[in-house]
Design a protein with these regions (language model features):
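N-terminal alpha-helical modules
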Residues: 20-126
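N-terminal signal peptide c-region/cleavage motif recognized by signal peptidases
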Residues: 15-19
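Bacterial N-terminal signal peptides that target proteins for export
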Residues: 1-9
Length: 126
């Protein structure tokens, strides 16, 4: 993603006024949590499926090595995603706290969708 701050600005400019006019702060936080939870649910499903595929398609020692590397990669990616979202949220510094929270949740979901694509397009055989 070349310009994450621009993505956040575009989201805020296009969608947030409508959302904010119809929702209170607590409703906005609930929507942000819903966006994040759904993206994480899809990410976990893709991750679990990849682990199953690795274990099914490889002998035990190789499978465990690959699964270990995948877990290491996933932990690092999660740290990156969370740090990137925090950076963009602070850098953007637009709107109210609730609007930033919703924008950051949407940006996090976009990063998560990219990771899901990465996990579902790993070449097979491993």
């Amino acid at each position: 993603m070349k310009h994450p701050t621009k993505l956040l600005f575009v989201f805020v400019a296009l969608f947030l006024p409508t959302i904010l006019s119809a929702q209170s702060g607590s409703e906005i936080y609930a929507e942000a949590n819903k966006i994040s939870a759904e993206a994480d649910k899809q990410l976990n499903a893709a991750y679990d499926q990849l682990i199953k595929s690795i274990r099914a398609d490889n002998e035990k020692d190789r499978a465990e090595l690959l699964v270990g590397r995948l877990k290491e990669s996933q932990r690092a990616w999660l740290k990156y995603r969370d740090a990137q979202v925090a950076f963009v949220g602070i850098h953007a510094n637009i709107g109210s706290a609730s609007s930033r929270t919703l924008g950051m949740a949407s940006y996090s979901a976009e990063l998560t969708k990219e990771r899901i694509k990465d996990l579902t397009t790993v070449p097979n055989p491993f």
